[in-house]
Amino acid sequence: MIDYINNNGISQHWNFFPQEKYRKIESDLKSLDYKATYQPSTNTYGNRLQAFPCYESYYFDENPYIKSRLEDLLKTKITEFKALARKIVLDEIRVSPQNFGKYGLVHKDTTYKTSIPNVADRPMIAGMMYFDQAYNGGTAFFFNQMEKTPDIYISAVPNRLVLYSGGIYHAPCFDYTFKERLTLSCFFKTEGMK
């Protein structure tokens, strides 16, 4: 499965966590101390609402458990791992001058420095866990950053983990019938990723 994901495959894993663990993680995320920020965080704006406004917090409590579940699923050892909780307030998205509609910023995810000389940074594997049932929410995947219509669209379903290469262009999808969008993103590197 790792080769499939690293070759731009997208895999879905329904009921990834046992219900009790899923509810505990959801409760943890709702009680985190989030930092008001924006994406892309490397750019400078007059204020955060001029970009893609969001709230973020690193999540640590269940990382050993999540990492172990992923290793069992993928049949490989994870060598680097981080989990990031992200909350999006849809009223803030509405006032952003970026004129977001259904899709947020089309982007690629976190990269890591390769150990091979003269080889460009490579994408980590990304995982997205949803905490709401939103047919119009979820994640859209694109062939390139300039596209306005996604090639693949995956709706948000609670406790469904979506795994993909961080090198695929993608964007969050917004369901404006909700006030907030809460997700847990995992970024990791496995053995053999040099």
Predicted regions and their residues:
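Catalytic core of non-heme Fe(II) oxygenases with the double-stranded beta-helix
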Residues: 86-194
